[in-house]
């Protein structure tokens, strides 16, 4: 689940309320390369009686391959992990700055406060996209084309700071978490996706991003590599879309593997 901290359309507390309203019992806010929404989401989750897993989704190189690594049950203050995601946040910020410059030159979005993105602790192109779509200034396709063209002039090593999958997994493990390959069906080059499987602890098999015929493929891959199969929605609330809880229940073995990393409200109150 994603919030306005990265590229989601709803605030962290609203995302947690939606999860509770739809009967979810354990949730994780997995914003891209950021933890700024954790406290707000966890506070609401615990007030609503949900277990909470501190988590994030780490972007890895090359970014166009969508080899995103979920870190579940991580220490959100761990220096190695914070240093890693700061590198990616720097790339995102330069992307956004370049895009905002192009939009301003074209006279698009003036008066909408887009310049405020320069002061946000984290920023992604998807956050700018949200504003453009909400005000009907561009179609989604045109907006992404505009964003890509804005960074075409960047040097070849522009994306070099983004970590490799191995770096991401190592940092997640160092922070005490479990590493899960998110939505493997979204990776254009499936051979590159398979290279990551020996590194991770789990595979996100059950997600709305997978077609029905893809599920057995990733079940077989998970079994072959001894990976726990996880459940996710990859919810972004795009264009105000409602939240639909997963139809597959999380494997109890994965919750057992997470153990004390799942923060239950009773534990918080006792502390």
What are these regions (language model features)?
Residues 43-191, 254, 259, 265, ...:
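Extended substrate/RNA-proximal surfaces in nucleic-acid metabolism proteins
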Residues 1-65, 146-157, 167-173, 178-181, ...:
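An N-terminally biased module of ancient metal coordination in phosphate/nucleic-acid-related enzymes
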Residues 243:
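Nucleotide-sugar donor-binding patch of glycosyltransferase catalytic domains
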